[in-house]
Structures are given as C-alpha cells and as structure tokens.
From Swiss-Prot:
Belongs to the LolA family. This is Outer-membrane lipoprotein carrier protein. Its main location: periplasm. Disulfide bonds: none annotated. It is found in: Periplasm. Participates in the translocation of lipoproteins from the inner membrane to the outer membrane. Only forms a complex with a lipoprotein if the residue after the N-terminal Cys is not an aspartate (The Asp acts as a targeting signal to indicate that the lipoprotein should stay in the inner membrane). Residues 178-203 are annotated as: Disordered. Monomer. One of its GO terms (cellular component) is outer membrane-bounded periplasmic space. Gene3D superfamilies: Lipoprotein localisation LolA/LolB/LppX.
Amino acid sequence: MKKMAIACALLSSVVASSVWADAASSLKSRLDKVSSFHATFTQKVTDGSGAAVQEGQGDLWVKRPNLFNWHMTQPDESILVSDGKTLWFYNPFVEQATATWLKDATGNTPFMLIARNQASDWQQYNIKQDGDNFVLTPKASNGNLKQFTINVGRDGTIHQFSAVEQDDQRSAYQLKSQQNGAVEPSKFTFTPPQGVTIDDQRK
C-alpha cells in the first residue's frame, strides 16, 4: 500500500509537471505570434484590502525579444526603455535617468516577462491555463511577486495582466487598441535630456 501511495504521488507530480509544461508552451506560442506591437494601457493598483492606491495610464511599444518602451503618462510620467542592451529608466519629475544592463535586469516582473517571452523565464514559474487566462506562481518564494496572471488570445493579443505581491498589493493593467506591426526604431532608443542626472550602473 505504501509503495502504491508513493507511485501515485510520483504520477501526480509527473502529470502536474506535464500540465505546467503544456501551459508554458501554449503561453509562449501565443505571445510568439506577435513580434511587435503598440498598445495603450490603464493601470489600477489596490492594497491587500482592495482599496484603491493608484490609477494611471500610458503607452507600450514592444519588439521581441529585447526591445520595448513602457511610457507611463499619468499620474506621473516615467519611461522604461530597452535598446536591446541597455535598460533605461527615466523620471522627468526628479530629472534622473538610470542605466543598467538588460541582461542583469530582473525577470520576475510581469512586464519583463511579457516583453522578453523567453523560455528560461517561464521555467521559473508553475503555470496553469484556463482558456485565455494563464496564472503563474513563482517556483522560488524569495521574491516579491506572489502571483502573475495574463490574458492573451490565440492570436497573440494581450488583453490584460495583473501581478499580486507578497503583501497582497495588486497591480492590474488593461491593454487597449493593440496594433500589431512594425514599430518606429526611435521608440527603442533613449538619449538623456540635457541637465538630467545619470545613474550609470553598467560599470
């Protein structure tokens, strides 16, 4: 009986691993259908009790695997740009820009996961699929991300995604007007404006 229980446990583990692998493959396959796009987005952040913390909006340009421009326009402007090698974060309000190597950037943020769509990133998560919804739970529990959900259609269109942090703060993003196709190369370059303080962490 004990051997049977162990065998059943092992079988369940194998089946679960297969399901997670299939879900990861399906998610990557769907995202791969669109190599570049532009979309507008709205953001809503709530705390652990569900109370609203912040609402915002902006524009997003992506050219996979490593080019993207995340431009938050409200409530405060901020820009996150990758030129394929360097990741720039610019805050106009404080007039500061930070430069880091993209290869050193964390892969456990929802936006980075979507923008890069790399198999090595998805392997860090247990993924469950329910129709167009994919729920990701980190295999390691030492990060700040508790759960990540993305809704992406069979045609590769991303409708929404959300992230829940360890303190249950939830950030939800609704994407609208996704336009698939070539993106102007200038969207993936960044030149710090004159007078801006630069924190270069690439050294």
